[in-house]
Amino acid sequence: MDNIRTVSDTKRKFYGYHTRPINSIYRRFVEELLVEMHLLSVNVDFKYDPIYALGVVTSFERFMQGYSPESDKTSIFNALCQAVDGNSEQYHQEAEALINEAKGLSITEFKEKLGQEGGDGILWGTCGAIAQNPKFKYSRLFGVGLYTLLMEIDPDLVKEEDKRNQTIKEVSDALQFSSDKLQKDLDLYRSNLDKMQQLLTVIEDTLEADRKKRASQKLEKKPEVVEEKEHKENEEQQQSSN
């Protein structure tokens, strides 16, 4: 029997692929995402699918906003995927393909086609396979991917809570998993996004205030430098005249 990869094994692989330090503001998110992906990857009922990939890509992009340098951000995502024996290009390509197929759909069309077996394209093929799989392993990241699709199809769902909740229930029923679980995951996801945005705003405001303070101090020093220079020139002129 093969040994199951441990969290420590996965973390070791991750830090072997990405060797640079991770900004402390983002480190907790990265490590929590890594552990979440690891636990799913070793679950016997879990099977990678493009909606899950969209959830991973969306979560990473939303929570890593403002990360610098950009090259490190790319390296971190690549390492996350490689650490669980995944392919970052596949994640990005299939996430993009889902979004492209969702464009132009109405929410009614989306709900009507959900769960139909043998649909064309990556979106309907994925949804059909999930609806027909009695052992489908729902995950929070899958929920984020599904939510991303719904927001792409009907952005007004963000503002219309009743409509959003009803849509989430209908979609969950069609794909045969708990709507309560999905709702709780999405509520937490949106709440954490708000908190992260507030934190980044505070940090940016602090940095901006610090920049203004340094600029002000620099301007205050300039007259002193000019005055000192003029004083020195006057002394030199007096000495030369003597």
UniProtKB/Swiss-Prot annotation:
GO terms for cellular component: plasma membrane-derived thylakoid photosystem II. Residues 217-235 have a biased composition (Basic and acidic residues). The keyword Coiled coil applies. One of its GO terms (biological process) is photosystem II assembly. The keyword Coiled coil applies. Pfam families: ThylakoidFormat (PF11264). Keywords: Coiled coil. InterPro entries: Thf1. Residues 178-209 form a coiled coil. Residues 212-242 are annotated as: Disordered. Belongs to the THF1 family. May be involved in photosynthetic membrane biogenesis. NCBIfam families: PS_II_psb29. This is Protein Thf1. The gene is thf1.
